[in-house]
């Protein structure tokens, strides 16, 4: 599943081709995505795109008339292509521009979304209760300490909770906890400010590095020009269960936590 870095890499790739361009057509070949593509999505036709933003794992395409909200789901991708590029399997939506280019949405598993909203995005049910962006100043040790107060859940589950901080998915939660030396099953509310400070630093550094590397390609993700991300080459624990720890040589442990694969080093990461 594309996580925050992959979505941000996609945003950076498509934005230069969309901003200040006028939409002349919206082609919906298959409206049966995670949520049906609404008829109102066609309201973007005739509008000029003002900006392309990211909130958590959602891409927001802004116009004066409203916002197109795009989620890549499990296997979605967006590509900038010449208009009339032949349609391939799983090419569900084309956003056609006046300059002869188009934005194409491909999603084999159809867990993605293409929605339309006319009110400020803060009021949309998908966006209204999201926590702070991890790369912003709003995500800081004191904010995290306050958000975790009294919580008995495992820290990894809290780190992946979009109400606490957005966009830290399974890959990067594993990596950040390893880098901070925190056991993923540690009771969140009992972690002291010193460890949380280090965790915040590592989350920010790892996400920023992943964006710089073009994201992490494990199976489905390619960026806006069809190229893979290269951060997978820098993973220390995710996908490395039973292999040697890159720091101490101990065999990494693999467990299921919140129905997600969790890999950690029992020596380097303490409760």
UniProtKB/Swiss-Prot annotation:
InterPro entries: DNA_glyclase/AP_lyase_DNA-bd, DNA_glyclase_Znf_dom_DNA_BS, Formamido-pyr_DNA_Glyclase, FPG_cat, MutM-like_N-ter, Ribosomal_uS13-like_H2TH, Znf_DNA_glyclase/AP_lyase, Znf_FPG/IleRS. Its EC number is 3.2.2.23, 4.2.99.18. Its cofactor is Zn(2+). Transmembrane segments: none annotated. GO terms for biological process: base-excision repair. Monomer. It catalyses: Hydrolysis of DNA containing ring-opened 7-methylguanine residues, releasing 2,6-diamino-4-hydroxy-5-(N-methyl)formamidopyrimidine; 2'-deoxyribonucleotide-(2'-deoxyribose 5'-phosphate)-2'-deoxyribonucleotide-DNA = a 3'-end 2'-deoxyribonucleotide-(2,3-dehydro-2,3-deoxyribose 5'-phosphate)-DNA + a 5'-end 5'-phospho-2'-deoxyribonucleoside-DNA + H(+). It comes from the Bacteria. Pfam families: Fapy_DNA_glyco (PF01149), H2TH (PF06831), zf-FPG_IleRS (PF06827). This is Formamidopyrimidine-DNA glycosylase. A zinc finger (FPG-type) spans 236-270. CDD domains: EcFpg-like_N (cd08966). Belongs to the FPG family. The active site is at 2 (schiff-base intermediate with dna), 3 (proton donor), 57 (proton donor), 260 (proton donor). Involved in base excision repair of DNA damaged by oxidation or by mutagenic agents. Acts as a DNA glycosylase that recognizes and removes damaged bases. Has a preference for oxidized purines, such as 7,8-dihydro-8-oxoguanine (8-oxoG). Has AP (apurinic/apyrimidinic) lyase activity and introduces nicks in the DNA strand. Cleaves the DNA backbone by beta-delta elimination to generate a single-strand break at the site of the removed base with both 3'- and 5'-phosphates. Binds 1 zinc ion per subunit. DNA binds at residues 90, 109, 151. Keywords: DNA damage, DNA repair, DNA-binding, Glycosidase, Hydrolase, Lyase, Metal-binding, Multifunctional enzyme, Zinc, Zinc-finger. GO terms for molecular function: 8-oxo-7,8-dihydroguanine DNA N-glycosylase activity; class I DNA-(apurinic or apyrimidinic site) endonuclease activity; damaged DNA binding; zinc ion binding.
């Amino acid at each position: 599943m594309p996580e925050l870095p992959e979505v941000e890499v996609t945003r950076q790739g498509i934005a230069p081709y969309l901003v200040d361009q006028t939409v002349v057509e919206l082609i919906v070949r298959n409206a049966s995505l995670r949520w049906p593509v609404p008829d109102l999505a066609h309201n973007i036709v005739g509008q000029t795109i003002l900006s392309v933003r990211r909130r958590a794992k959602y891409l927001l395409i802004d116009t004066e008339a409203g916002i197109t909200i795009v989620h890549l789901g499990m296997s979605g991708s967006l590509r900038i292509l010449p208009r009339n590029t032949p349609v391939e399997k799983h090419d569900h939506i084309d956003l056609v521009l006046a300059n002869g280019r188009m934005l194409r949405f491909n999603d084999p598993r159809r867990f993605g979304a293409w929605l339309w909203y006319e009110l400020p995005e803060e009021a949309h049910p998908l966006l209204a209760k999201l926590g702070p962006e991890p790369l912003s100043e709003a995500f800081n040790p004191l904010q995290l300490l306050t958000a975790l107060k009294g919580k008995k859940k495992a820290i990894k589950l809290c780190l992946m909770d979009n109400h606490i901080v957005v966009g830290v998915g399974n890959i990067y939660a594993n990596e950040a906890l390893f880098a901070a030396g925190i056991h993923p099953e540690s009771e969140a509310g009992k972690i002291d400010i010193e460890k949380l400070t280090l965790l915040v630093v590592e989350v920010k550094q790892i996400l920023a590095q992943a964006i710089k590397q073009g994201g992490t390609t494990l199976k489905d993700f390619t960026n806006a020009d069809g190229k893979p991300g290269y951060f997978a080459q820098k993973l220390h624990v995710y996908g490395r269960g039973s292999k040697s720890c890159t720091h101490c040589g101990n065999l990494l442990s693999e467990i299921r936590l919140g129905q997600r694969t969790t890999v950690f080093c029992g020596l380097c990461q303490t409760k």
